[in-house]
């Protein structure tokens, strides 16, 4: 210390101590550490966000996978129903084609034993007057137009003409009896065929109506599930946008 003497006494001067380091200003090393910490924090935040998005995507995929098997089953059921309808329509069309295009049946031989006698070929019925016999013969001919194909299919018109000739002549023999029996058997076959066709058509219409109702119900269920899936996706998208 330097001493000075003055009027008021001795004065001593305190030397200035210079600061050897700047403690207030950060160094480059501190700045690098700070930047590294910030980068690590940002990376951790990004990783957390990515993990969160991955979890959400996995959840959506799992939920979609749960809905997909149900949709596939419903589509398979709908396709099977369409195939069944197509098959039924094909069967109906084939039956109609067979009725129209099948080869004619060979007439039975006149020497074949007659089947069970009906009211037409009993002895009493054959003893009627020619007018009554003509009425009995003409009644099967007056069938509706829709049955004309069956009559032509079984070759009924020639036999009816032959029977009319026999009745007009008034002669009765084995040939006329066999002709009457053959005609009756053919008409019985026609009646059985018509009954079977009408029964099959009625049953098929009932099954088709029931299948149509099942298809409508399955379509309604499919539409409801589609709407639910769309709403679920919208809600997930809204949640993701809100978090961003």
Swiss-Prot record:
| Compartment(s) where it occurs, according to its Swiss-Prot or TrEMBL record | Nucleus
- Biased-composition ranges, Gly residues, are 1-10
Signal peptide positions are: none
Family according to the record: Belongs to the plant Mediator complex subunit 9 family.
Biased amino acid composition, Low complexity: 96-111, 122-131
User: What keywords sit in the KW lines?
Assistant: Coiled coil, Nucleus, Transcription, Transcription regulation
Please list where the region (Disordered) is annotated.
1-28, 96-131
The residue stretches assigned to a coiled coil in this entry are: 212-239
Under the subunit heading, UniProt states:
Component of the Mediator complex. Interacts with MEE14/CBP1.
Q: Which PANTHER family match?
A: MEDIATOR OF RNA POLYMERASE II TRANSCRIPTION SUBUNIT-RELATED
Its domain of life reads Eukaryota
Q: Does the keyword Transmembrane apply?
A: no
> What is the protein named?
Mediator of RNA polymerase II transcription subunit 9
User: What parts of the sequence cross the membrane?
Assistant: none
What does the UniProt record say this protein does?
A: Component of the Mediator complex, a coactivator involved in the regulated transcription of nearly all RNA polymerase II-dependent genes. Mediator functions as a bridge to convey information from gene-specific regulatory proteins to the basal RNA polymerase II transcription machinery. The Mediator complex, having a compact conformation in its free form, is recruited to promoters by direct interactions with regulatory proteins and serves for the assembly of a functional pre-initiation complex with RNA polymerase II and the general transcription factors.
Q: Where is the composition biased (Polar residues)?
A: 13-28
A single GO CC term for this protein reads: mediator complex
